[in-house]
Amino acid sequence: MTGEIISIQVGQCGNQVGKQFWGQLAREHGIGVDGQSLHPEDANVVREDDTNVFFRQNDHNRFTPRALLYDLEPSAIGDVQNCFPGFFNERNVWISKEELGAGNTWSIGYDYGLEKQDEFMNMIDKEIDATGNFEGFQLIHSVAGGTGSGLGSNLLEALSDRYHKKIVSTYSVFPSRESEVVVQPYNTILTLRRLIDNSDASVLFDNDALLNLTARVLRDSNTSYQQTNQLIASVMSSVTNSLRFPSYMYNSLPSIFSTLVPTPELHFLAPSFTPFTSDFVPGAKDFKRLSAYDVILDLFDKNNSMVTRDTDTPVYLAIYDALQGAVEQSDVTRAILKTQQRIKFAPWSPTSLHVNLGRKSPYNSSANSDYVSGMMLANTSSIVSVFQKTVSSFDVIFKRGAFLHKFQNGKMFQHGWDEFLESREVIQGVIDEYIAAEQENYLDDVLEEDGNFVGGDAEMIDIESNDDII
């Protein structure tokens, strides 16, 4: 039985992305915006979807998300509640009574988390009490603002400390290169350290890549964050498809992430998606029908990535593809063979990829919903460009001492700026680790130092196994 997953959405970005995610899940499971089943007449039909992973269900066929919503100002959560009246458990919604926000400052959000930590953890404990086979968390947030970064960081630390045997995954949005938040490099470097230290798997997005992709795939040329957030929701839905529409493989978060994370430090994943069928993104441009062969190869195109990539020849450590639609297994086999010739894998990594054939929702059909679509999570050394940009932007303003006064009242900075320097050092360590992972003897060196992988003491998975390929 697939375990339950609790979603925690923090700050404006986290709650706006969460709104799109829950809308997508509701459509895929035939649930209305008020939580009522849209198909009560099908009560005698055995459902093939597992709503229990993300929803509680009462005796009146009403569904409530396993979700907690946090923010320090009311607008984003208010919008969620207006769009989904009565959908969320009101006891799982927290808006700061002061409603002042975090002023785009990491330390304000982090200190608020320290102040309210007992109350926050009590909310989480109660939600866990309503599960029967709790599997883990997914945190949705931005790394650049004040609440998503600061409060999100505090919650990450608390979750990994209290529930260290459970999976803690994140969907983390990085900012555009051009931003009006002057302390963005500080917020990002402090948050990235917590993603390194306290997350088991982090799926990264950046707004520049998202905006470019949105402009390409939508008919409407006026892109908005609601549209880019729907792209993120499409990835989140696809990652969990095999949990919610269970298959005999990849039906848990550990089974997915253990294929992607070779060592604890290297747990950052770059998502790609193509094509966007109308059951994922309403208003997507028309496109020709593609085979699974075409889709798998197109997922490697950097224009379909949701993280900006600075190289055309990335080195891959591990790859997981989730396909939906009318897939021919012969096309999958041909694509796997082609990637072995075309894609550069780390020397110690088998030149294969994991492919999961998921199922489309019977409740969310559209004109092209039987078309093949694909989502890829890639663990690749090209992800270091995100970290290098973070470090570079931090160095520029930190060396000038610019805007440090915004952090001087933070509890962590009462005795100086060591936390900034330590965070930079931790991030540089991961950059070095990814670069080292391109070498043939990398895994031998790691195994000599530490045999632990995702989930604690799990052994390295043999990803060459035919049973693991399709």
UniProtKB/Swiss-Prot annotation:
It is found in: Cytoplasm, Cytoskeleton, Microtubule organizing center, Spindle pole body. PROSITE patterns: TUBULIN. The keyword Cytoplasm applies. It comes from Eremothecium gossypii (strain ATCC 10895 / CBS 109.51 / FGSC 9923 / NRRL Y-1056) (Yeast). Disulfide bonds: none annotated. One of its GO terms (biological process) is microtubule nucleation by spindle pole body. GO terms for molecular function: GTP binding; microtubule nucleator activity; structural constituent of cytoskeleton. Pfam families: Tubulin, Tubulin_C. Belongs to the tubulin family. Transmembrane segments: none annotated. This is Tubulin gamma chain. Keywords: Cytoplasm, Cytoskeleton, GTP-binding, Microtubule, Nucleotide-binding. One of its GO terms (cellular component) is cytoplasm. It comes from the Eukaryota. PANTHER family: TUBULIN.
